[in-house]
A protein has these predicted regions:
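A structural signal for short, well-ordered beta-strand segments and their strand-loop junctions
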Residues: 30-31, 88, 318-319
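Leucine-rich repeat
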Residues: 181-191, 215-222, 246-258
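Acidic, glycine- and Ser/Thr-rich low-complexity intrinsically disordered tracts
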Residues: 68, 72-73, 227-235, 239-350
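Short, well-ordered beta-to-alpha junction loops that form the rim of enzyme active sites
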Residues: 31-34, 82, 149-150
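A short local loop/turn or secondary-structure capping micro-motif enriched for an aromatic residue
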Residues: 37-38, 98, 154-155, 327, ...
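Right-handed parallel beta-helix
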Residues: 1, 5, 10-28, 39-59, ...
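Short, recurring structural edge motifs at helix starts
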Residues: 5-7, 33-35, 77, 113-124, ...
């Protein structure tokens, strides 16, 4: 890690992590992941450039590894396993890949009651709550943002942590999410494995996302014996759907097993708002009738009206004045991220 915390018996916080160039193999910023009796709070992560050099990724030339030529273990840019009241704003996150214990997602919000080799669950009070991620750009990664409440250990002998709730993600760009970065190329994973107190109250609003065209916009799941998730708000986003837009993550007893967007969303969440999104290039197998109502479905990228799409890799995603999605948000703003505001937020991040 470049910065780590959340594994102690003392009350930590407030934290300000600002104006840094952060480079690390595992995670550039990590809170949690071990034994703790208290949770770090009031954390601001502002105006940082998160970075992993491509020389660390096997297959690249030149390749730089550790002793004996083994590759470094790469996980993600930001992972929260034990943190409350967190603001992540105006960060640039470049280059992340899977191939080890993770699959290339740039950001993980995953409260964890860490399981030790001796069989102990050492952080039942760990939680990730009240997190806002805004005006942030994640690029060149195996996946976008993962929001998961999972059991520790192998999922059989482990135990849940305390809470995963109240996540707000807005005015974020996720581009060049690609399977070539040893991941699924999915924009969002939303999954619960806790029997009680499930993952809940997630807002994804005004996000522009380009998952791998052969992959997914969202992977979701929750076993039928668990308490259902609730409180999903997915609105005003502008995102490619991928070939398999809303896909199952938890096997044959999962709420998302049928892989049909409206069915999966309805079965996985007892309460949700999923509307006023621009869902780009939906495949023929998933026409508008298989989605929640009140969404928009541009059939091609050209129908959106980006200033410069650039194949979803470093483009200018501000909407042209002629775009049919200009000022079409429920708040009167453009669908997708506030690109002008994002560029201003990142102007001095190098």
């Amino acid at each position: 890690h470049a910065v780590a915390g959340g594994v102690s018996d003392t009350q930590d916080g407030p934290f300000l992590i600002q104006d840094n160039f952060l480079e690390a193999t595992g995670e550039e910023v990590m809170f949690g992941g071990g034994a703790a009796t208290l949770t770090p709070s009031d954390i601001e992560i502002l105006n940082n450039h998160f970075w992993k050099p491509w020389q660390w990724m096997p297959g690249n030339t030149p390749f730089v590894g550790g002793p004996n030529g083994n590759p470094f273990i790469v996980k993600n840019h930001l992972e929260l396993k034990n943190a409350v009241r967190v603001l992540v704003e105006a960060n640039l996150m470049d280059n992340n890949w899977g191939g080890f214990s993770q699959t290339g997602y740039g950001i993980l919000l995953t409260p964890k009651n860490q399981h030790t080799q001796s069989g102990a669950d050492v952080c039942p009070l760990c939680q990730v709550t009240d997190v806002t991620i805004r005006y942030t750009y994640v690029s060149h990664a195996g996946g976008g943002i993962q929001m998961v409440t999972d059991l520790s250990g192998n999922g059989k002998d482990g135990a849940p942590a305390l809470a995963g709730t109240r996540f707000s993600i807005h005015d974020v760009v996720l581009d060049d999410l690609n399977k070539k970065y040893v991941g699924g190329g999915t924009a969002f994973m939303i999954m619960n494995a806790w029997p009680k107190n499930p993952l809940n109250t997630i807002t994804v609003n005004h996000v522009t996302a380009f998952p791998d065209p052969s992959s997914h916009m969202i992977i979701m799941g929750n076993l039928s014996q668990n308490a259902p998730m609730y409180g999903l708000v997915f609105t005003n986003n502008l995102t490619v759907t991928g070939q398999y837009p809303v896909w199952n993550a938890e096997g044959s007893t999962s709420c998302a097993f049928e892989d049909v967007p409206i069915t999966s969303i309805t079965k996985c969440f007892t309460s949700y708002t999923f509307g006023n999104n621009g869902l780009i290039t939906p495949p023929p197998a998933f026409p508008p009738s298989k989605w929640p109502s009140n969404n928009m479905f541009p059939q091609t990228i050209n129908d959106v009206g980006f200033t410069n799409y650039n194949n979803g890799n470093g483009g200018n995603y501000e909407l042209l004045s002629s775009s049919p999605y200009k000022n079409k948000g429920t708040d009167g703003k453009d669908l997708g991220a506030d690109i002008v505001g994002l560029n201003q937020a990142l102007a001095n991040v190098e």
